[in-house]
């Protein structure tokens, strides 16, 4: 029986759609999939039904199955159908119909009609309430769509779907993680699988649903991958659903099941029984082609998960047959051929073993399977074992031969171990399979003996052999024909029978005598067995034993040397026992007499085939010698096969034997031995002419013969091809090689190619050319059997061959020309028209292909070359251009390859001593460069020209113009590494050749090159400029080229500035600085001097027409610079000097980059002890020249440019102004340049160079700038420069009187000395410092402010250094400085006022730091300066104040602060001064110690009262004063904290008397209200900080505050702010009372009356503060009943009807606050309050009534815990 809760839930569910009231019905009706609730609520069923019917009709057109619902769910009668009044059976039928509809509609939710049709079911049948599970299940796979979100918004989620609850009202759809959580619930999983089962039964599955289901199942498995318990729970569910999916006819269902099974088995390895059952289920219903691949993949992966023993056993018979019926051999092999096939060795092993057990007809596919899969060792072992067992029962064992050959090829040891484990040996197994298998040649002699001579022969055995003989009687041979000539197939059958007979235990002699009736046939058969690779080793040994027997039966007169060649071939056998047996037979033959009657001499190798034999004596001698030298351990017998004596005879003999012997194996052996003979020559190869010539025709028969005899056909052909010997003279042999290359046989072609490569170098040139041409011709055939290009590139070709082959494949024949005139090739339209013909076009393409292949080969060889080859290549370049321009063929690759070959050839010629070339076609190169559209080709051609430059300077002279014009226009604009390297290399090679051949015009050529390159500078990629131009400058010689280059760049810099391209100008400066990095400092200085010389030339041309004409012909000035107007020229000169300034100045970046810093580069040379003295002298000379040049321009700037303007007579008068401006600017820039130049030298050199100029120079500007530079020169110098600094200081001190008339020089001298004193300080001589201080104190009184400022700065630094030693100058420093400050305050027009005040402040700061005790007397003056230096930034003044606080006695500071406030600050109306004063005071208070604070407390409180009175005398606005007072309160609170009660209490009393009585008031203008306001603000702040510590201090205030409160009541005192402050002070005191101070009856009675009576006229704005105060008083006294009664009575007095509304309102609020805080203490007083409350509830003022009802009454009820109405009743 279900629980009560379950029963209630069921009742609720049944009644979910029953609506008993209107709201409930409206809510049910408004639930909609389409409309919002408001719209849905207004719709009737007829409207909804009409829309749904139309939608259903549309769905029926898509899926006819929907039509059935038009008679049920969508019938007219359904409009009036109410499911709440239906019977159970009717409801069940309705639910079934709805479920069927939802199943069918599940795949159509992406269609709008589905939504509209389902809307009817929601609105009429409430499926979102009654059929929730089916609705959710059928739409769950749409969980990320808006449709599902809409369903969630109207549905009531069943318990199993609670995971979706977070998304019911969310804008976001459910996530994939939500689905995992949902499916991870076992109950839900069972529900969903049940639903899926219904879908499968009704064929309602679809791809999207299956994809969703599969993904969810997979995610659940992955989610629980580490939870074996949960995975085991999933086993029955997933297997069940997989089985149902597999039972479906749908291929999608089956593929889904496959996926689920694979993933699940991977996560949790299943038992083999389950996997076999799954495999059977997978196969049972498998028909669709697409599903078959998935099924096979699944089966393989399932088997791969198996672990432990028996995982690769044979499949059960039933499953194997089922699998066999579904998958044919081709499909399995196709599956295994795919690159993405899975690891499937376990299944393939099981399947292979199953074939061996159940279906032997398919043994032939096992090998194909094994070759396509990699098996584990144990798997291979099991298959081998199965096949060995199978060999025992299989009649036709030939099926197993290939399998075991494969196994032996991959692991012979494993096969032998398997045989051994089954009690077999390799020899016996070979006999069983009737073929040779193993390479291991060591056989067991006992086995051979056992096989050769069975122990005893019974009648039964005889009968059995007779039966065997009768069965194979067709193979009996009764003729004396040699078995060596027998066909391969017949021999193979006889060999198999022989092996089988031996294996069955029959005697070998019985078999031989029965199947071969003649001695000849027996012996030749046994010989063939001996040399047959197909024969087992044991059988060969048996054969050798029988040969020995049969030889003895041959007559003595017969010479059996004819058998020797075959036996010699048998010596190649791997088995030493076989070779030993052969040697024994050879010994028997050697013992026989040598007669002329040779055994089978005309039949052994075929009927009527006469074998040329040796002379009997020679044969006897040869055999004897061979046996003496032969050792059985030796495989290689080539050395002893042809003895030196009669070598030619023996070579001829063996050559004939190799030609005539029919066995391919024997032929291979003999040919190998012949080819190894060092004396074998091509003369012997003539024997093979007929055989070789017809070999290709007979190749297929030889191939079959090799296969039948198990002879390696590749080895056979290699031996044959190796007959082509080095220095081959026979043309038929060369033809054979070429025929082999051109044949369709890939193996033969490759062997021929290898042989050709090895002997090519030994052939004559005609043969080489023939071969190369053949290969080139073959290369045009895309179906060649060998790698034509690879072979051609592997041949050792020389330059003559290349020249010949290139000429043979050339379309122009200009090599015979001797007159290489420098002309351009001309083309006619006829050549273009010719190329339009298809035949000609095809020939051209073929020609291009051949040419490309030849060039590739040449490019790979590299180490060949000759002048003839070079000219040929250049000629071909012209051919390619023709093919490109006229034929339109793709010659780009061929051109690049040809150029590469040309470069290699030139390099080769240089390396091999070639120094000069003549008649080089330069026009071809230039034409190719200009006409090519490929930057790569152009670049490589430039490299060719560069390489030719040293070999043919004539080419350069005739081509330099087009070459460099082209480079400037194209190459240097390319942004790639290769092009850059090309241009650099061209420069490095071409420029020297150009200069070498310039013949006196070197400068002109150099300037032409520089102009060409700099013109294209803007087009060169920025990151490649430095490398390119650095290469150019270095190649041209920086000493000669740098000045001209800088001038050209200066022009571009000026142009950029004129056109406002500031970015470009900056880039040019960076470029030049980076360029100068790679140059030596001497070269850099020389370049700058050359630049100044060029500028001098240019300026002189403006004053002399003759000089101008002489410069017009110079390339450097050919760009219009000589034709500038006056203004343009002045601008250019200004910008040029600015350019020089920029490249010589030292920036922050240069400071950190040693390579860019000119000064450091000079230092590194001058200070390096290893530097060459000549170099140092050159640098000094160059520097002197540079300094001289700059000074020349400075001294002559006005004269120079006035001469220029005098030539311009037509200029307007404003040009004079322009000239003046330009001259001033140029002069300023020149002085900057001078400073840069002077900084270049080390300090000692610099000082020696500059100091004399200060005395000798008459130009004031020069002296000014020189002095200015001195100051900056020492910035980076260390203490080692002290002697130099002393010297400089002395000179400057001496110069000062002389420069007194010049303000700027005086100022700069003082500033320089200031900088030096600041840097070197105490290290300077004391006398110099004293002189400097004396000078400075004198100059303080100067009339010029600039000098005053500089003097003050020098004094400051000197005082810093001298300290107390400067005390003698104190009267000359401090008083004058104060006077200066006061004078500056009065002087409002001085533009340097700020700087002067800063200088004074800094001076005082220095004095404070160094001599603070001496400054005490003037500390007031110092503060005066600080507070009133209005021009100085506040941060500076605050810093000086900090110094005062740190260094001056704070007691004295506090006294001075009181004085200065009273005398100056208070009356100044300067907010900044007041602010700085307060900052000083604050810092003083913070830093003063408690003892000092206590001793100075009277002064501080005097100052405090003065600050309180500031309000009455200040003209500041109220907000400003309030901020000042707030700061004062903070400071005073900090001060109070440093005092004890004993000291502070009397001072507090003084404050109280000052506030209430006016005692001690210094300013009569301050009112009582202002005093009280100041006091209470201070007191309230004090209470916040000290809290209960000063509660008792209220004693001094009690009566005055009581009187003040009464004055507020009587309105004698009216100030809302003051009233608020007083009330707040009481509140704070009450709040912080910890000592029951306010519980004293006397204090309580005194203050309670006056405080409560404030209710009578309290202002609304501060009423809340009064309420808080009364509440605090009540709370403080809550434990004293008498006080509670008094307070209650006092408050009630103000709640009576006679009181004003405002009074009653605040009284009510006070009472409410009291009851909310301490209501329980006041409950006893409630009876007194009830009548008052009752009266107030009937008050005419609604606000009062509301406040009582909603406020006071509610609070009282909370305290009482019961309604207040009872008390009222």
Curated annotation (Swiss-Prot):
Gene3D superfamilies membership: Leucine-rich Repeat Variant
Assembly with partners or alone: Interacts with snoRNA U3. Interacts with MPP10. Component of the ribosomal small subunit (SSU) processome composed of at least 40 protein subunits and snoRNA U3. In the absence of snoRNA3, forms a complex with other t-UTPs. This complex can associate with pre-18S ribosomal RNAs.
GO molecular function: snoRNA binding; U3 snoRNA binding
Record InterPro entries: ARM-like, ARM-type_fold, BP28_C_dom, HEAT_type_2, HEAT_Utp10/HEAT1, U3snoRNP10_N, UTP10
GO term, biological process aspect, one: endonucleolytic cleavage to generate mature 5'-end of SSU-rRNA from (SSU-rRNA, 5.8S rRNA, LSU-rRNA)
Listed GO CC annotations: 90S preribosome; mitochondrion; nucleolus; nucleoplasm; preribosome, small subunit precursor; rDNA heterochromatin; small-subunit processome; t-UTP complex
Purpose of the protein: Involved in nucleolar processing of pre-18S ribosomal RNA. Required for optimal pre-ribosomal RNA transcription by RNA polymerase I together with a subset of U3 proteins required for transcription (t-UTPs). Involved in ribosome biosynthesis.
Coiled coil: none
Modified residues (N-acetylserine): 2
Organism in which the protein naturally occurs: Saccharomyces cerevisiae (strain ATCC 204508 / S288c)
Keyword Transcription regulation set for record: no
Keyword Mitochondrion listed: yes
Origin: domain of life: Eukaryota
Misc remark: Present with 18200 molecules/cell in log phase SD medium.
Keywords from the UniProt entry: Acetylation, Mitochondrion, Nucleus, Ribonucleoprotein, Ribosome biogenesis, rRNA processing, Transcription
UniProt similarity note: Belongs to the HEATR1/UTP10 family.
Stated name of the protein: U3 small nucleolar RNA-associated protein 10
Main localization of the protein described in the UniProt heading: nucleus
Residue stretches of each HEAT repeat: 1729-1767
Localization, UniProt: Nucleus, Nucleolus; Mitochondrion
